[in-house]
Amino acid sequence: MNQEKIMKARMWTAIFIALAALVAAFVFAGLYSDEKTKTRQSYIDQYEYNITQAADEIDKYLEKQTDYDLHYNMVLSDMGAARSFIFLVDDYAEHQKTINELHYCFVKYPVQMKDKLEEVSTALRHITEHLDKGYDEVREIVESVDRLGN
């Protein structure tokens, strides 16, 4: 009889530990999901911030028309940072491809891109306003670049 009580107590302890572990697993999964969502949103916020910075830098150059190299390099830097952050967001593959192509055009074809700065600024503003036409405008700009030129 004594042995039976000990086994019953051990069984209840095992059940209690199993339930506690199950609850802990659910809590961990919930916290992980919440943190993942926050991190994703922070990446998107940084992406949009860098896109805004690039558009602001283009606007500064268009307004003053001085020190092109400085403003162009700042735009390159901001576009590179935006590219890096959008890479970290899973379901932004099409947007990532579009931004990568625009950044590539800025790197490889600076002479051609100088003539398209106003269009790029408008497209980037549309992107930060969450308008899909901004990505379409960027695609049009990228397609209009002569890949055989400079």
What is each of the regions a protein language model found here?
Residues 27, 94-112, 128-136:
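Hydrophobic transmembrane alpha-helix bundles
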Residues 1-20:
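N-terminal Sec-pathway targeting helices
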Residues 4-8, 36-41, 60, 140-143, ...:
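Polar/charged alpha-helical tracts
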Residues 22-45:
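Transmembrane signal-anchor/signal-peptide helices with a preference for the extracytoplasmic
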Residues 42-106, 125-126:
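Alpha-helical segments in soluble extracytoplasmic regions
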